[in-house]
Amino acid sequence: VVISIRDQRGVTVPKRQVEESARRASRDFELFYEQQRSQNAREVKKTGPILAITADGKGVPMLKSELREATRKAAEERQPRLKHRRSPGEKSKTKRMSTVAAVYTIEPFARTPEQIVRELAPIHEALPQRPRPEDKRVWASIKHPPEAIIKQAFEEAQRRDPKHTKEWIALVDGNQTQLDLLRLAAKDYGVKLVIILDLIHVLEYLWKAAWAFHDAGDRAAESWVGERLAEILRGHSSSVAAGMRRSATLRGLSEVERAPIDDCADYLLKYREFLHYDRYLAKGYPIATGVIEGACRYLVKDRMEITGARWSLEGAEAFLRLRSLRASGDFDEYWDFHLQQEYKRNHEARYENGQVPLPNPAPESKPKASRLRLVK
């Protein structure tokens, strides 16, 4: 917006003015969604039978004064290894985690393990057109803790399905805090929640294990990954974990060489209760976190992580709210609501009973006499 104003009008808007405008514009964000939940302001659409909840964390570069205490201390104690840039793997310690959440409904899309493997192949077989997420709402917050955002996600889901007639699922990446919060919220709301581990995270572990067995660039690694992925999709994750460990032992790999294999096996065993992909595929559930990954990219990475950016807490929260409204398709409705609230604050609040008097009608003006004279 600032760039558009500058290019079209030749006016430069100061940064602080933009931040203040964003804070004022986003001040009714929570009230807007609270009203929707309490009054069911927006009619719940007839949507697919699967109701998905998903959340993730994404770091935002902050001013040092706005970092959490532990992160600020780590930033102050950090000793840079290089003078002008960070070395590989070195962290800046300047980020504060935001929590990103998404709630949507979707139609079932049943698939087979073989179809998934072929779809993930470099030259993949095109599947039938998959259903798109419906009535998707995404949002992010850096001020509120993860438990508050998970609660908001369940409140949004409850608004859409108050009688719990849909199938509730949660797509996760394996973060233990997130898993604990989801289970607790499901218990509080009395809903049966199916938790599904993101398949792409599983695939990343498989590829790391594959390179422990194969030389770099060896095409046999693709077949190795495909075979084990198919078995995991058939619901045999524990057998895959045991098999790759046994293979590493028979090959006599050292502790360092087999570390990626053990990490993959540990991952599969730790989360095996969320790896029943055979059931998920048969019921047509989504098995990847593409929606929340896209939300993290749009809401946080594309705007908040631009080169040199350092955010204040209030400024970051304001921009996250506005981008969330735009991404969810709620901005126009929110803006009408925000203008109503501004009218109440700036006008109705100043008069008794909120009755703003009508302006006095303008006095009628007499028609001016013509200055032209008839000359005979």
Model-inferred region functions:
Residues 1-376:
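Catalytic center-proximal scaffold of phosphoryl-transfer enzymes
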